[in-house]
């Protein structure tokens, strides 16, 4: 009779758990009225306008026009979500339904939305989960100067100024005579956002294939976008400079924050959350000790390092105020530092509740240069 070897040699194979899939932050959703997609299906993903035509869209549909601009971006976006809006449905209700149906898209582009719709969507985007941005196009000339619209007694500011006054960080507005021009901007952003080394970007001064530049005065551009010295109403325009350069200005959200900063901070937050969750689910337990907390700090360090490699985080001097032992004027050689409060200082209530001591992630962004002043000194 042959006896089993496992009483002498017992081998257990432990297969490492899979990490959660990282959201790409590289897909926009176009929301329009065409009926090629039913409200029951609600959202479909496309890789080309040809696929949209095969699915029942026509070249006359606004979704097709916007998608053509999106896929024409020089950065080569690979995917676009298209959402359905019911005939009697509000843009807000449709956007919420699209988000419930599909959580992977990042930027919402409503087609032919009125100012009232944009205001509702902008408010929703500020708190939507997962993180969401709103990008819209307006051809309303009242956005080009400090004017109000409407009847006397019911006058309102133009949409750029109204969203700026609300300090909305998740709304990107573009003035353009080209229908759905903002789709071209988001096509560039979603295609460029690969997460690879040195892939960080800014939207300022980018060329937008398919979008016609608007004939605006310097005063109008300054009112909308501002410049290195003055603030505008934080809109965006596409203009020609010096008969040679067709450029987008300035790449800002309604509160003045640059688009790329909002995008990368959303991505960093997502990476940290998933990295820590992967750690918690892959270990028998994380002890409430300094080594245990250090294991959490280690995965956060790894997450931050990805954004050093992409070019969003870079070495620099910290001027963000005192955080534990970090003081203003300290050089962050890595571009970031992760600090935690001592386990010994933890309250008994937090320890009993199995809460980790507070952890602080301090980063220095690489920033970007949009304006240059040059002095030419000549000696005869």
Model-derived features: positions:
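Surface-exposed assembly/interface segments
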Residues: 1-380
């Amino acid at each position: 009779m042959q006896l089993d070897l496992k009483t002498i040699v017992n081998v257990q194979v432990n297969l490492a758990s899979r990490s959660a899939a990282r959201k790409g932050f590289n897909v926009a959703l176009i929301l329009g009225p065409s009926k090629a997609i039913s409200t029951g299906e609600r959202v479909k993903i496309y890789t080309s306008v040809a696929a949209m035509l095969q699915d029942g869209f026509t070249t006359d549909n606004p979704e097709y026009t916007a998608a053509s601009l999106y896929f024409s971006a020089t950065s080569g976006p690979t995917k676009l979500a298209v959402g359905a809006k019911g005939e009697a449905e509000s843009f807000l209700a449709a956007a919420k339904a699209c988000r419930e149906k599909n959580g992977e898209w990042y930027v919402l582009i409503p087609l032919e939305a009125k100012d009232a719709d944009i205001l509702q969507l902008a408010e929703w985007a500020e708190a939507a989960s997962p993180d969401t941005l709103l990008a819209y196009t307006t051809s309303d000339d009242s956005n080009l100067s400090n004017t109000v619209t409407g009847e006397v007694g019911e006058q309102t500011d133009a949409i750029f100024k109204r969203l700026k006054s609300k300090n909305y960080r998740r709304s990107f507005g573009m003035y353009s005579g080209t229908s759905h021009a903002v789709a071209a901007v988001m096509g560039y952003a979603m295609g460029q956002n690969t997460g690879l080394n040195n892939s960080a970007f800014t939207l300022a001064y980018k060329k937008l294939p398919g979008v016609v530049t608007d004939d605006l005065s310097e005063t109008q551009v300054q009112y909308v976008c501002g410049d290195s010295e003055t603030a505008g109403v934080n809109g965006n325009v596409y203009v020609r400079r010096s008969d040679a350069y067709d450029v987008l200005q300035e790449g800002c959200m309604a509160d003045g924050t640059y688009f790329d900063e909002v995008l990368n901070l959303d991505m960093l937050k997502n990476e940290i959350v998933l990295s820590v969750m992967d750690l918690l689910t892959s270990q028998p337990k994380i002890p409430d000790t300094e080594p245990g907390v250090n294991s959490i700090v280690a995965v956060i360090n790894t997450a931050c390092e990805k954004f050093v490699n992409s070019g969003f985080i870079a070495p620099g001097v910290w001027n963000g105020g005192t955080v534990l032992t970090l003081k203003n004027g300290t050089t962050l050689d890595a571009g970031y530092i992760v600090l935690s409060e001592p386990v010994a200082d933890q309250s008994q209530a937090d320890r009993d509740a199995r809460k980790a001591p507070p952890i602080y992630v301090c980063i220095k962004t690489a920033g970007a240069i949009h304006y240059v002043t040059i002095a030419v000194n000549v000696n005869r």
